[in-house]
Each structure stands twice: as structure tokens, then as C-alpha cells.
């Protein structure tokens, strides 16, 4: 399955000057919501991702996503894996588990995002779950921006990666684009970074 083509066909691979939720600036932005607005395509992508996870023979009892960007991807992945789905959300800028969601002690959970950049949001989600007694067994995403190391990829983890090295990250593709710290972003010389989606917008 050509993941890059899926994003291009959905007009979800945007070019410009963007502020990512990780804080980095980039000339490309992956707008997964545009891909996931097609339920059939969302199902196909989730089935592809589930296949990778099932081949790893992991015992997963639940999928959890940080709101809002990860919710559709996480729900479809949970459906493909045949497990329940929950999500965390920000309250006063702090990640929390709400809406009556509960986790059991030692419940094995995969944290799923639509896109993994540094993995910061995924780790905030994981921390909430671990504090409630859950066991994080893996991370998942439709796409990995190449900072974190994913299973079945030759790319190594880069500076800024937040995901733990002892847990696998499953994703359908690596999208490696230039990313810059705001203090050294060459794009800022000619334009102002915009934030087309995700945290805070």
C-alpha cells in the first residue's frame, strides 16, 4: 500500500511553512484528518497497521489515543485488532483520562497517534495510563516523521525522540522532511509559520 500516495491523493501532504505540535517548523505538514475522512480508506490503513502489530505477537487489550488528532486512527486500529478503545484529552494543558474511561491494573495498552513526530503527546498519554496502573506495550501511528525509530525501518532515532527505545513503534511509513527549531528556521526569514491543525488549533 502506497501511504505517500494516499496522503497526496487526499490533498493531505501540504507544502508551506508550518508550526508542528512538537514545536518544530517544517516545510511539509501531514494532515491525516483529510485521509481519515474516507471511512473505507481509514479501515484499510488500520488493517495494514494491525497486520504489523499482529505479526509481532503482542498481547494488546486496549488502544488509547491522545485527542484530538489520534482519535480516528486509534479507533480504527482498535476495531481492526478487535479490542476496546479509549482516549486521553487535555484539560488546562494537562493530559487526562476522562468521560468515565478506566483502565485495569496491568492492562496492556498500545498508544496510537495519527502522526508521530517526537512522540511527546504519545508519551503524555502513556504517562497518564501508567499512573493508573496500565502497562504500555507499544506505540502506533499511520506515519512517522523520522525522528523516532519505528519497527521495520532502517532509520535510527534522532535527537528529540521521546519514545522509549525498548518499546516498538509501528507505523506504515517514514516521512522524512526538513524540520527546524524556531530559533534557527530558514523559512522564518520570508514567512510566518502557520498551524493548520492538531494541538491548540
UniProtKB/Swiss-Prot annotation:
It catalyses: orotidine 5'-phosphate + diphosphate = orotate + 5-phospho-alpha-D-ribose 1-diphosphate. GO terms for molecular function: magnesium ion binding; orotate phosphoribosyltransferase activity. Orotate binds at residues 117, 145. GO terms for biological process: 'de novo' UMP biosynthetic process; pyrimidine nucleobase biosynthetic process; UMP biosynthetic process. Keywords: Glycosyltransferase, Magnesium, Pyrimidine biosynthesis, Transferase. 5-phospho-alpha-D-ribose 1-diphosphate binds at residues 113-121. Its EC number is 2.4.2.10. It is an enzyme of class 2 (transferase). InterPro entries: OPRT (IPR023031), Orotate_PRibTrfase_bac (IPR006273), PRibTrfase_dom (IPR000836), PRTase-like (IPR029057). Disulfide bonds: none annotated. Pathway: Pyrimidine metabolism; UMP biosynthesis via de novo pathway; UMP from orotate: step 1/2. Gene3D superfamilies: 3.40.50.2020. Its cofactor is Mg(2+). Homodimer. Belongs to the purine/pyrimidine phosphoribosyltransferase family. PyrE subfamily. Catalyzes the transfer of a ribosyl phosphate group from 5-phosphoribose 1-diphosphate to orotate, leading to the formation of orotidine monophosphate (OMP). This is Orotate phosphoribosyltransferase. It comes from Helicobacter pylori (strain ATCC 700392 / 26695). The lineage of its organism: Bacteria, Pseudomonadati, Campylobacterota, Epsilonproteobacteria, Campylobacterales. The gene is pyrE.
Amino acid at each position: 500500500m502506497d501511504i505517500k500516495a494516499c496522503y497526496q491523493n487526499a490533498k493531505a501532504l501540504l507544502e508551506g511553512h508550518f508550526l508542528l505540535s512538537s514545536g518544530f517548523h517544517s516545510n511539509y505538514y501531514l494532515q491525516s484528518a483529510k485521509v481519515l475522512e474516507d471511512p473505507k480508506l481509514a479501515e484499510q490503513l488500520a488493517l495494514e497497521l494491525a497486520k504489523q502489530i499482529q505479526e509481532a505477537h503482542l498481547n494488546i487489550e486496549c488502544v488509547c489515543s491522545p485527542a484530538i488528532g489520534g482519535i480516528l486512527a486509534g479507533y480504527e486500529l482498535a476495531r481492526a485488532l478487535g479490542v476496546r478503545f479509549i482516549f486521553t484529552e487535555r484539560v488546562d494543558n494537562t493530559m487526562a483520562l476522562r468521560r468515565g474511561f478506566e483502565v485495569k491494573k496491568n492492562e496492556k495498552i498500545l498508544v496510537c497517534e495519527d502522526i508521530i513526530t517526537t512522540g511527546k503527546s504519545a508519551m503524555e498519554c502513556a504517562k497518564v495510563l501508567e499512573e493508573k496502573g496500565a502497562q504500555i506495550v507499544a506505540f502506533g501511528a499511520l506515519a512517522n516523521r523520522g525522528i523516532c525509530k519505528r519497527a521495520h525501518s532502517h532509520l535510527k532515532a534522532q535527537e528529540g525522540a521521546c519514545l522509549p527505545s525498548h518499546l516498538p513503534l509501528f507505523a506504515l511509513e517514514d516521512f522524512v522532511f526538513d524540520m527546524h527549531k524556531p530559533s534557527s528556521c530558514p523559512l522564518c526569514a520570508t514567512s510566518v509559520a502557520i498551524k493548520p491543525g492538531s494541538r491548540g488549533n
